[in-house]
């Protein structure tokens, strides 16, 4: 995206990057996936407070602009994307070399095609 934006101003702007419709999950399902991939002792509990502001139970990014302009499609399904996100945050929590972790994840991602 950045390379195209540098070459041609018609690509300027912002783009949402997210899952296909078939991979959209509720916020609770997303939390469940995070806990599953983090492992013990991770847990979460849905506790609604009486006067709390409304929280959306389902959030979705509209990636139509990105798909139309670049022919983009997600490579990882939601489970894999969450697993890789958890892996990165675990590396951060363990004070690992985040540059190395990030570069490895990029290599893995680019090798999927």
Language-model segments: what does each one mean?
Residues 25-37, 81-85:
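PAPS/PAP-binding and catalytic site of the sulfotransferase fold
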Residues 3-7, 38, 93:
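Protein kinase-like catalytic domain
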Residues 14, 51-73, 92-94:
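Conserved C-terminal active-site "lid" loop/helix of NAD(P)H-dependent oxidoreductases
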Residues 78-113:
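Amphipathic terminal alpha-helices
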Residues 13-15, 28-31, 39-58, 101-107:
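C-terminal "lid/loop" region of Rossmann-like NAD(P)-dependent oxidoreductases
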Residues 7, 19-23:
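Glycine-rich "substrate-gating" loop/helix at the edge of Rossmann-like oxidoreductase active sites
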Residues 1-15:
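Alpha-helical substrate-binding/gating segment
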């Amino acid at each position: 995206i950045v390379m195209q934006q540098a070459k041609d101003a018609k690509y300027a702007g912002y783009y949402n990057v997210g899952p296909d419709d078939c991979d959209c999950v509720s916020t609770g399902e997303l939390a469940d996936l995070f806990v599953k991939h983090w492992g013990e002792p991770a847990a979460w509990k849905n506790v609604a407070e009486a006067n709390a502001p409304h929280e959306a139970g389902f959030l979705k990014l509209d990636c139509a602009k990105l798909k139309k302009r670049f022919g983009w499609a997600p490579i990882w399904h939601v489970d894999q994307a969450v697993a890789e996100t958890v892996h990165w945050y675990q590396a951060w929590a363990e004070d690992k070399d985040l540059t190395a972790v990030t570069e490895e994840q990029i290599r893995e991602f680019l090798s999927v095609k």
